[in-house]
Swiss-Prot record:
Protein name in UniProt: Tyrosine--tRNA ligase
Residues bound to ATP: 246
Positions occupied by motif 'HIGH' region: 59-68
Domain spans labelled S4 RNA-binding: 351-411
UniProt cross-references to InterPro entries, sorted A to Z: aa-tRNA-synth_I_CS (IPR001412), aa-tRNA-synth_Ic (IPR002305), Rossmann-like_a/b/a_fold (IPR014729), S4_RNA-bd (IPR002942), S4_RNA-bd_sf (IPR036986), Tyr-tRNA-ligase (IPR002307), Tyr-tRNA-ligase_bac-type (IPR024088), Tyr-tRNA-ligase_bac_2 (IPR024108)
């Protein structure tokens, strides 16, 4: 009688499984290991047991932008295929601070900061995910009880040499930049999350690949079936050059007003539009391919940019808001003043134009105001302001900065 261990059953790759795999692979950077994941999908289809899909996010900031939703969109697609989505809030790992992509130690957050940020984190994510089909977990559930003994045992499962394979650690080590011991623990703790959750698939950005692979290795050591990993690209910002970031000002916040969100999305280049369609839209890829063919046939790209902007605004607000945002955008494009602009009352006339723009909330600083004047981007009652030394007399007028910022100003002495 053979003493060889029995091999795992092989499940058939049906059309349903092929469709699920195609949906999973849309817009991804890497899916590792694809053959393993196809078998996981096939087993799920054959047995009716949903896969456990994990996404861990550290609440390092209270607000998210549409760049963060790229991976959330993928989670929603997998959710719609019937799988269990685990939205993991890294309240414990936030105390360490993720060193991924860093050239210096990241300052850890306080417990108070983490709890404050986490309050709004899932509420915003739920604008993309199906709230009723999402399992919310906190990694402090299993990380805190580990204690010193458990942490030492976990640390013994990975070597310093393996940790130093990370490019960011290697650069810091070779450059003589300090690396704290607690930073070595971060990928181990993130990997242990996958063990605790028995994850079948873990998602993350391309900068998370090393951490995701650690989870796969730890599952093997703990005798679990290894998770597959799926990395999503980092979304380019409105400039189409650098990744979307609040610090770079090239972002669209998901809590922004519908008109602002719509206007920003309409400002992207025609080339970048296709990237946003692939990563942010839920439209089928064959439909998007049809849009491209229509443009090649002479259709105006603006028509499809409108569809993209409306879809995204409707997702985070409503369809009615998306329609109103389009009307507002068209009105502004014709040189009109929106109906819903804020009214501001200021004192101190005659007031320097830079101060007026700042106090009206149209720019963050007087230097930004002067830059806009230099670029011809400031208007009072439709007339372009070119004099940076202008003193504005008392009165009532509409002030405009750029294409989308307006205020109805009443200036008194």
């Amino acid at each position: 009688m053979s003493t060889e261990p029995s091999s795992k059953p092989v499940f058939p790759i049906t059309d349903e499984v092929r469709h699920a795999l195609a949906v999973t692979k849309r817009g991804v950077d890497e899916l590792l290991v694809e053959e393993e994941f196809a078998q996981k999908l096939a087993r799920s289809a054959a047995t009716g047991t949903p896969l456990r899909i994990k996404l861990g996010l550290d609440p390092t900031a209270p607000d998210i932008h549409i760049g963060h939703t790229v991976v959330l969109n993928k989670m929603r697609q997998l959710q719609d295929l019937g799988h269990t989505v685990i939205f993991l809030i890294g309240d414990f790992t936030s105390l360490i601070g993720d060193p991924s992509g860093r050239n210096a130690t990241r300052p850890p957050l306080t417990r108070e900061q983490i709890e404050s940020n986490a309050k709004t984190y899932f509420e915003q994510a739920a604008l993309v995910l199906d709230r009723d089909k999402t399992e919310i977990r906190y990694n402090s559930e299993w990380s805190m009880p580990l204690g010193a003994d458990g942490m030492i045992k976990l640390a013994s499962r990975y070597t310093v040499a393996r940790i130093l394979e990370r490019e960011d650690f290697t650069k810091r080590f070779q450059g003589g930049v300090p690396i704290s011991i607690h930073e070595f623990l971060y990928p181990l703790m993130q990997g242990y999350d996958s063990v605790a959750l028995n994850a079948d698939l873990e998602l993350g950005g391309t900068d998370q690949k090393f951490n995701l692979l650690v989870g796969r290795e730890l599952q093997k050591q703990y005798g679990q079936e290894q998770q597959c990993i799926l990395t999503m690209p980092l979304l380019e910002g409105l400039d189409g050059v650098e990744k979307m970031s609040k610090s770079k000002g090239n972002y669209v916040g998901i809590s922004e007003q519908p008109t602002d969100m719509f206007g920003k999305l309409m400002s992207i280049s025609d080339t970048l539009m296709w990237r946003y369609f692939e990563l942010l839209s839920f439209r089928p890829m064959d439909e998007i391919g049809g849009f491209k063919r229509e443009i090649e046939g002479g259709r105006n790209p603006r028509d499809f940019k409108v569809l993209l902007a409306q879809e995204i605004v409707a997702r985070f607000h409503s369809q009615a808001d998306a329609e109103r945002a389009l009307e507002d955008f068209n009105h502004r494009a014709k040189g009109g003043v929106p109906d819903d602009i804020p009214s501001v009352t200021l004192a101190g006339a005659p007031l320097a134009i830079g101060q007026l723009l700042k106090q009206a909330g149209l720019v963050p600083s007087t230097s930004e105001a002067l830059r806009n004047i230099e670029q011809g981007g400031v208007k009072i009652d439709g007339a372009t302001v070119s004099d940076k030394g202008l003193k504005v007399e008392a009165g009532e007028f509409v002030v405009q900065v750029g294409k989308r910022r307006f205020a109805r100003v009443t200036l008194t002495a």
